[in-house]
């Protein structure tokens, strides 16, 4: 590691959904308002959607969430109170993937387990709007009768990338399609996974077309299980590991799923997946550690649209995405490693 990685202090939130939500909103008021500014601009310029229209669309999900996960609504309402904003504002943040269905999210993720490696690992670069580097939080949620969650998230969003005290972890890849229904938003699906006690329970939360729009969830467990799940409101496909590894970027891999929807994948997603697959096949051995995984995530092949993603002057402002944070998780030993910015800054 060439220099000290930039991180953010972990914030531990404990208690009821209201308690954790209120503290989240209170401690992250500035970061939440930065998120609101980022997405107001993005919806207006990229999706031609006003904030009022975004609120109306987000509200379409309330009935489904209320029926299946009422505690999520309680937590979001409390975040709004703590941050001195409206409930609809926080709801929009948690539905932001559904409001801009073809927004240019990027991400490269992979999972490793036996026989490829001794330990079970999850790792990814999260590529998004550079403004959101100022909204990133490291949260630990301690809840009654539920696993303790540790995750890296955008301020105001209650589900993101992380793991829990039962050894269940999840990474996320956006998929650009035309599919949407008023079901469980992607980020709330991530939270549902993180509240699971077992690998099987985690899969059951998202594998029956419960999710409102298309995405890829990469799930791993300290039981040494890993699985890719490409989800949507109309079709869901589970992809099993080959020789102890799985990798994904931002296009649909299931041939059956491709037939059920229109997809708007970018060419660099296919390039990144090929590069990532080759790196894993050629360089991974059983005794790897998190620093080695970050070296893979620092790869610059096909720069600037590389695994470690940089500003691309050939793209419009609306299309720009960069690596905002990198994360590696050891599910067996509860190792949680991450930092802000691009991994090439440190490896």
Give residue ranges: language-model regions:
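Short, charged, low-complexity patches
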Residues: 179-187, 195, 199, 269
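Internal mixed beta-strand/loop scaffold within catalytic domains of large alpha/beta enzymes
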Residues: 95-187, 324, 336-339, 345-346
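Cysteine-dependent hydrolase recognition
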Residues: 168, 192-193
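Short, charged/polar low-complexity linear motifs in solvent-exposed/disordered segments
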Residues: 138-141, 188-190, 219, 245-246
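Solvent-exposed, amphipathic alpha-helical segments
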Residues: 189-192, 279
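C-terminus-biased signal that marks the final domain/tail of proteins
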Residues: 1-105, 115, 196-236, 244-347
